[in-house]
């Protein structure tokens, strides 16, 4: 038996040694001479590349990245991604703001004549150089590139911003060739790089008066005519960046680390900044802390550069130099410095493939940054410090809440998803939050010292190499003897949901309700006051633990690092009820109920004071409810609304979830002050909604709902009669959140059966309507919105008698919408009967979407008992300040109807145009019609309306429903 164990150990060791000995990577030596012309914004350069083939293969070509060409046109992958991220600066840039290689040739250093540079496609970001005879294993080849590069305006990393030149991705780089072949990919803003380790000799020149910050260390500096020169070196790095500006001053200091390593630190900043003088202190603190945690800093220099505000990237790491945007808060500066300096270990020295595994370097670096912040700020979390304490609920980082919310809503994408296919939110959560949380969870399992020891040994083993994430997990398992197979479940996108399902005496049962079998810490408190902490691995079968003492309480995942989507069931006893105000992230130790005092108003209830009570904010729960009673001081009535909903979620490529909802609301609708009688309505609406699945990166969202509405409206002050409706609505909504051309479609089929007590026998109709909206972005922050609407009665028992919308005949198609046309009580109106001079100018955007308010006395104008259609236009001004909320609008509509049952159908055209002020994309708006059709004009004249009395307003609270936004926001 003992001999067998020895043999097994020998086999394992030999396998590990063999795997290490099989590892190889290519090597590059660069010799670059570059000159910056600030008058033309052009770099002229020679780039010598000595490429060492350490692979077992003969290479007949070498692939190169020419990433600066991403800024040469507006059809590049970078341009497409910028739009998907909601950034339009590059799309609307002038041709003169673009850049890229103007000229580029390549030759062998040992021969005259040019070599071919064959581009992979028209984008010219990826090219290969055919090598005659190839480069055999163990051999090398020397190439020289001659090029002129026009520097674009600053959009992402590379470019000119004010006086600052950001010189990154500025030279041809060989693509990585490893055991999986060539790794070629286009330049992206969201998604970084993978390059060969190299040594650099770089000579930089810029006009006198500019200060040059650069990777590596300086070997010589001199001036010649109007230019200054710097000769620099950098070893064991996979990139080289530099920055030039006449605005920099330099602070420098030699910092001795605790291991006696000396690092030359430089801060390049603007002289008049009030925050950046603290940068040196923060940099020294971070450098010393992280070197203590991880081991030797990999270079002899460290430079921090103050950047500008523009562009898509807030801060970027390069070997031995970091650039940080012009932050305006001290804690933000410290946070950015901590993160970017942390990249010296994970990114600069550990050269993982950032395009395939962004969560590797960003996750480990975020973990280091969090350790630093916690050390220097007594456990503070930078994310949470940005919010008031009443919102937090716990010390769990807010981005971890967002991560769990994405997973709960089945909008999360697996970490194995290629970066180019990720949505913006999922990229950020995958790379920074999940990546760091996995290591934090490892620390929760193993403890601070053990994880520090493991990361240090991993750094030593893989320094200046290209590991993959699997290498890290294997290293942790080997050094800790724990099973991390559950981490692969998380990488694949499986949800974590473990539960303490039963505790009886000293027996505890743990059930795995999710699909991820991740190991978790379990903290037990016994009835005698003692505690025990152990690691458990919930599997698909119940895990039953027998303890020797009675259990008082137990917490699974006490540090909240497992990404468990249902932390409430991680505790015994189950959480009690906690009362909180307004909103916030749920507390894991309590079932939170939120309270929000509210104030409201309508013409019949008067000023209303209310209290909203609800159980869910973010992340949204499956079971959600809201109770919001109001007291109306004018009516003396208790009014308000409530709803409850439940979500059933699916891991499907067809349906994301099904939501079941029941709502009820009731408010006053009229009053008789003399008789002291109030009329009110009540609405009850059960609904089932299918939320269809769309890839999270697609910007698409759609749902189909079946809603049954019952409304009852008092119509007699004698309280003897009530108007009732039974409305069935089948509605399909489709949204496309594209930045350049957002659009949405609603198709609805509505059947309504209604009657009015003794006044009217039961009547019914069937109506089909279509609402399509399309936006066209025609400049930075300038958009033209077009809306098309059409509706037709397919069947109608009463409209054949020419009845229009009133208490006895519902559902007219209205080109002009106000409270009295909102027959199903969908929206919020201050005055539904058009009787209050203060509130009757409120209009709605449903139906024809006209911006005029004619009042209930003119209710027949623009209504149809047969067919109607409309077009609504609104646009920013093509000149002036684009961010001003001032817009132009124009509405045109056609309504076909008949005045008497015997009359033929007759169509009529209406139009109205003017100016409007819109806030929050339709949340609130004020409209002033200036040009109107004859019939509308006649009413204005008959009522002697002046310009101010034509002003109308609208509010669309449904569009900004906080519960729907929290549940169904799309990024």
Which ranges hold each PLM region?
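Glycine/proline-rich low-complexity spacer/linker segments in large multi-domain proteins
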Residues: 74-88, 148-200, 253-255, 562-589
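C-terminal outer-membrane beta-barrel translocator/porin domains of Gram-negative envelope proteins
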Residues: 599, 657-676, 684-691, 714, ...
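Beta-strand-rich binding/interaction modules
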Residues: 21-22, 213-214, 483-486, 498-558
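Acidic/His/Gly-enriched intrinsically disordered linker/tail segments
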Residues: 356, 362-437
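Hydrophobic helix-coil surface modules that form long, contiguous segments used
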Residues: 176-178, 182, 190-338, 367-370
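Outer-membrane beta-barrel initiation region
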Residues: 520, 532, 536-539, 544-656, ...
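Amphipathic alpha-helical substructures
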Residues: 421, 426-504
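A surface-exposed beta-strand-loop module
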Residues: 52, 87-163, 540-549, 566
């Amino acid at each position: 038996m003992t001999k067998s164990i020895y043999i097994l150990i020998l086999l394992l060791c030999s396998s590990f040694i063999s795997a290490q000995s099989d590892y190889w990577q290519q090597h590059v030596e660069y010799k670059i001479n570059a000159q910056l012309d600030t008058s033309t914004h052009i770099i002229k350069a020679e780039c010598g590349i000595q490429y060492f083939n350490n692979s077992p293969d003969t290479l007949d070509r070498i692939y190169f990245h020419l990433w600066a060409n991403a800024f040469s046109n507006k059809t590049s992958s970078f341009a497409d991604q910028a739009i998907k991220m909601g950034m339009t600066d590059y799309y609307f840039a002038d041709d003169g703001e673009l850049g890229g290689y103007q000229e580029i040739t390549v030759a062998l250093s040992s021969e005259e004549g040019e070599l071919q540079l064959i581009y992979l496609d028209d984008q010219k970001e990826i090219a290969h150089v055919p090598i005659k005879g190839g480069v055999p294993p163990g051999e090398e080849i020397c190439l020289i590139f001659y090029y002129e590069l026009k520097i674009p305006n600053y959009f992402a990393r590379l470019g000119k911003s004010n006086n600052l030149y950001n010189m990154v991705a500025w030279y041809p780089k060989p693509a990585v060739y490893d055991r999986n072949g060539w790794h070629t990919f286009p330049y992206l803003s969201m998604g970084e790089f993978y390059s060969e380790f190299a040594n650099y000799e770089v000579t930089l020149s810029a006009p006198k008066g500019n200060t040059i910050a650069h990777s590596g260390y300086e070997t010589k500096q001199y001036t010649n005519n109007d230019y200054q020169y710097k000769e620099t070196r950098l070893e064991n790095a996979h990139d080289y960046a530099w920055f030039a500006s006449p605005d920099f001053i330099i602070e420098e200091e030699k910092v001795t680390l605790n291991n006696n390593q000396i690092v030359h630190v430089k801060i390049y900043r603007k002289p008049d900044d009030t925050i950046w003088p603290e940068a040196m202190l923060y940099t020294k603190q971070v450098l010393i802390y992280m070197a203590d945690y991880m081991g030797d800093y990999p270079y002899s220099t460290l430079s921090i550069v103050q950047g500008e505000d523009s562009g898509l990237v807030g801060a970027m790491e390069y070997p031995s130099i970091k650039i940080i945007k012009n932050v305006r808060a001290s804690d933000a500066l410290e946070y950015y410095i901590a993160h970017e300096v942390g990249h010296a270990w994970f990114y600069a020295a550990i050269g993982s493939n950032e395009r395939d595994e962004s969560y590797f370097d960003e996750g480990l670096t975020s973990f280091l940054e969090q350790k630093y912040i916690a050390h220097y700020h007594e456990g503070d979390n930078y994310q949470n410090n940005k919010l008031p304490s009443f919102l937090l609920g716990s010390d769990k980082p807010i981005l971890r809440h967002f991560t769990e919310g994405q997973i709960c809503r089945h909008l999360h994408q697996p970490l194995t998803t290629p970066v180019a296919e990720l949505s913006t939110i999922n990229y950020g959560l995958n790379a920074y939050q999940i990546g760091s949380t996995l290591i934090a969870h490892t620390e929760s399992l193993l403890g601070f010292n053990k994880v520090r020891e493991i990361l240090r040994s991993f750094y030593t083993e893989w320094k200046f190499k290209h590991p993959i994430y699997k290498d890290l997990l294997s290293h942790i398992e080997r050094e800790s003897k724990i099973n991390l197979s559950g981490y692969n479940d998380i990488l694949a996108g499986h949800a974590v949901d473990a539960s303490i399902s039963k505790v009886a005496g000293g027996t505890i049962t743990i059930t795995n309700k999710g699909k991820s079998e991740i190991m978790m810490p379990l903290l037990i408190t016994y009835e005698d006051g003692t505690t025990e902490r152990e690691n458990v691995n919930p599997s698909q079968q119940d895990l039953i633990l027998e303890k020797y003492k009675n259990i008082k309480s137990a917490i699974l995942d006490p540090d909240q690092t497992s990404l468990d989507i249902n932390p409430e069931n991680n505790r015994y006893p189950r959480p009690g009820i906690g009362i909180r105000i307004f909103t916030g992230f749920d507390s894991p130790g309590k079932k939170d109920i939120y309270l929000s005092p509210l104030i409201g108003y309508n013409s019949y209830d008067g000023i209303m004071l209310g209290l909203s009570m609800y159980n869910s904010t973010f992340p949204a729960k499956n079971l959600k409810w809201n109770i919001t009673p109001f007291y109306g001081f004018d009516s003396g009535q208790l009014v308000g609304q409530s709803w409850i909903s439940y979500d059933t979620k699916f891991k499907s490529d067809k349906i994301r979830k099904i939501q079941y909802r029941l709502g009820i609301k009731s408010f006053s609708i009229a009053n008789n002050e003399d008789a002291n009688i109030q009329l009110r309505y009540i609405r009850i609406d059960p609904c089932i909604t299918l939320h269809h699945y769309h890839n999270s990166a697609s910007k698409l969202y759609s749902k189909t709902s079946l809603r049954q509405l019952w409304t009852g409206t008092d119509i007699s002050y004698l309280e003897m009669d009530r108007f009732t409706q039974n409305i069935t609505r089948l509605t399909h909504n489709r949204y496309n959140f594209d930045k350049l051309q957002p659009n949405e479609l609603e198709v609805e089929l509505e059947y309504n059966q209604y009657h009015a007590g003794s006044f009217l026998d039961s009547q019914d109709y069937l109506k089909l309507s279509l609402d399509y909206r399309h936006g066209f972005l025609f400049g930075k922050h300038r958009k033209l919105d077009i809306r098309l609407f059409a509706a037709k009665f397919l069947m109608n028992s009463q409209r054949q008698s020419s009845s229009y919308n009133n208490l006895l005949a519902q559902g007219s198609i209205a080109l002009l919408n106000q409270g009295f046309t909102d027959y199903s009580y969908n929206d919020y109106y201050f005055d539904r009967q058009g009787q209050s001079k203060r509130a009757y100018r409120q209009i709605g955007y449903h139906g024809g979407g006209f911006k005029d308010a004619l009042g209930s006395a003119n209710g027949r104008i623009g209504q149809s008992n047969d067919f109607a259609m409309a077009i609504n236009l609104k646009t920013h001004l093509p000149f002036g300040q684009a961010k001003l909320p001032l817009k132009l609008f124009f509405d045109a509509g056609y309504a076909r109807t008949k005045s008497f049952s015997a009359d033929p159908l007759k169509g009529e055209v209406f139009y109205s145009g003017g100016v409007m002020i819109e806030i929050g994309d339709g949340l609130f708006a004020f409209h002033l019609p200036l040009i109107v059709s004859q019939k509308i004009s006649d009413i204005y004249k008959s009522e002697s309306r002046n310009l101010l009395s034509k002003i109308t307003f609208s509010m669309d609270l449904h569009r900004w429903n906080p519960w729907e936004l929290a549940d169904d926001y799309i990024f």
